[in-house]
Design a protein with these regions (language model features):
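Membrane-interfacial loop-to-helix junctions in multi-pass inner-membrane proteins
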Residues: 1-3, 52-68, 96-100, 129-141
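Acidic/polar loop patches that form or flank catalytic/metal-binding clefts of enzymes
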Residues: 48-62, 86-88, 115-119, 123-128
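A conserved hydrophobic secondary-structure block that centers on an alpha-helix together
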Residues: 1-14
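Hydrophobic cores of alpha-helical transmembrane segments in multi-pass inner/ER membrane proteins
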Residues: 35-50, 101-121, 146-151
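Specific lipid-exposed transmembrane alpha-helices and their immediate membrane-water interface residues
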Residues: 77-90, 109-124, 145-159
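Membrane-interface interhelical loops and short amphipathic "cap" helices
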Residues: 11-35, 56, 80-102, 127-133, ...
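Aromatic-anchored segments of alpha-helical transmembrane domains
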Residues: 9-10, 69-78
Length: 159
C-alpha cells in the first residue's frame, strides 16, 4: 500500500510540475525528487522479492535488506529535505538543529536495524533452489538492477 501511494505521489507531482508550474519537464533529477525515487526503486525490488520469498522461501535475507534499505532511504530523504544540507527548490527548511535530530534518528534506526539483521541472519539462510534460467533468476537480476539504480541515484544526489 505504501508503494502505491509513493507511486501516486511521484506521478501526481511530476504531472503537476509539468502542467501547472510550466517547468517544461516531468523530472529534473533534483535531490529531493531523487529522495522519493530511491525508496521507490528499492520498494519495487522488495515487492518482487517478497513474491519469491512467499512462494518459494528464497531471497529471505535479500528481502529483509531491501526493507531496511527502502525505509532507511525514506528517512534519508526526510533528512535531506528538512536539514538544509542540500540546495534544492524543494528544500523546506534550513534549520541545522532539526537536521541533527533527524540525522540521529537515521543513525539509530539504521544501526539498530542492521544490528538485528546481523544477529538473526543465520536463521534467514536457506530457501529454495532454482535453475540458472528461471523466473527467480530473472527477479534476482531485476532486483540487482533496481538496487544499482537506487545506489546510483544516491551517489548522484550526495555527490
Amino acid at each position: 500500500m505504501a508503494w502505491v501511494f509513493l507511486t501516486a505521489g511521484i506521478a501526481v507531482g511530476s504531472g503537476w510540475a509539468y502542467y501547472e508550474l510550466g517547468w517544461g519537464g516531468w523530472w529534473f533529477w533534483d535531490p529531493v525528487e531523487n529522495a522519493s525515487f530511491m525508496p521507490w526503486l528499492l520498494g519495487t525490488a522488495l515487492i518482487h522479492s517478497l513474491a519469491v520469498t512467499e512462494k518459494r522461501g528464497a531471497f529471505r535475507s535479500w528481502t529483509v535488506l531491501l526493507a531496511i534499505g527502502a525505509f532507511s532511504l525514506s528517512l534519508l530523504g526526510t533528512f535531506l529535505v528538512r536539514s538544509g544540507v542540500i540546495t534544492s527548490v524543494h528544500a523546506f527548511a534550513t534549520d541545522p538543529k532539526r537536521g541533527l535530530y533527524i540525522l540521529a534518528l537515521l543513525v539509530i534506526v539504521i544501526g539498530c536495524s542492521l544490528f538485528l539483521y546481523a544477529m538473526r541472519a543465520p536463521r534467514l539462510a536457506g530457501g529454495g533452489s532454482f535453475g540458472l534460467v528461471s523466473r527467480e533468476t530473472g527477479l534476482l537480476g531485476n532486483n540487482g538492477l533496481l538496487t544499482v539504480g537506487s545506489a546510483s541515484g544516491l551517489l548522484g544526489t550526495l555527490y
